């Protein structure tokens, strides 16, 4: 199954909120612009299919994680961040380990029809990252994903070493807050243009997961234009809720 490459979310070292030339403080952003709705409940936890579970952990236990310490951005709402990740104890840094192309292709082949059935629309795979390693002190700031390519997504939980689990903060279309916790074998299907993050600082040695992303098969410029004025980064829950109180 072909995978479409997504656009970069930075341009000339400067954050771009959605489409190029649209920054987080662009005066055209409007609280009246909200994300599309595909499902009454925009997230669902399932179990990773056995054939993917076995392949994932066969690869995982042989991986070496590399630190990604470059590319720190000075975000106007989050401060210092790498890919939306801050750290309360040190400069932001994350780790990464790639998985095989064969696993990514197999995962898209298996997961795509599952996400299509759940969302009710035909999808086109866009991008998958390897396994992301969040170190002690990490905060994943509240955000929406990239409207060109990250419209429907899934999180595959991989591993953690920590005294407590680490919640994903997810806000549905009515802006209700949900905490989602993961254990081995858990997968979260979610509408990734809904606001989400992990706002409680992580305490532990590491937390690891991976992401797969899709866009609707029909998602041309006229649909993107509809959502280009949608704000996609927020300092915290209060900022997010107050922003939409304007409507």
Predicted regions, residues:
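A structural signal for short, well-ordered beta-strand segments and their strand-loop junctions
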Residues: 45, 70, 124-126, 189-190, ...
């Amino acid at each position: 199954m072909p995978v479409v490459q997504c656009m970069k979310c930075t341009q000339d070292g400067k954050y771009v909120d959605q489409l190029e030339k649209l920054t987080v403080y662009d005066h055209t952003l409007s609280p009246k612009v909200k994300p599309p709705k595909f499902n009454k409940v925009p997230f669902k936890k399932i179990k990773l299919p056995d054939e993917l579970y076995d392949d994932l952990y066969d690869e995982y236990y042989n991986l070496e994680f590399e630190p990604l310490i470059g590319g720190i951005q000075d975000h106007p709402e989050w401060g210092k961040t790498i890919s939306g990740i801050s750290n309360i104890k040190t400069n932001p840094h994350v780790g990464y380990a790639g998985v095989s192309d064969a696993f990514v292709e197999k995962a898209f082949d298996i997961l795509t029809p599952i996400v299509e059935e759940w969302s009710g629309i035909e999808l086109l795979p866009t991008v998958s990252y390897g396994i992301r390693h969040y170190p002690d002190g990490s905060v994943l700031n509240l955000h929406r994903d990239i409207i060109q390519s990250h419209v429907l997504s899934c999180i595959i939980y991989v591993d953690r070493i920590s005294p407590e689990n680490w919640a994903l903060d997810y806000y549905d279309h009515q802006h209700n807050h949900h905490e989602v916790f993961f254990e081995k074998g858990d997968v979260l299907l979610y509408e990734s243009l809904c606001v989400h993050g992990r706002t409680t600082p992580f305490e532990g040695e590491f937390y690891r997961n991976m992401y797969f992303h899709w866009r609707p098969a029909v998602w041309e410029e006229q649909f993107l234009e509809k959502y280009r004025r949608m704000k996609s980064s927020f300092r915290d829950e209060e900022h997010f809720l107050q922003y939409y109180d304007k409507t």
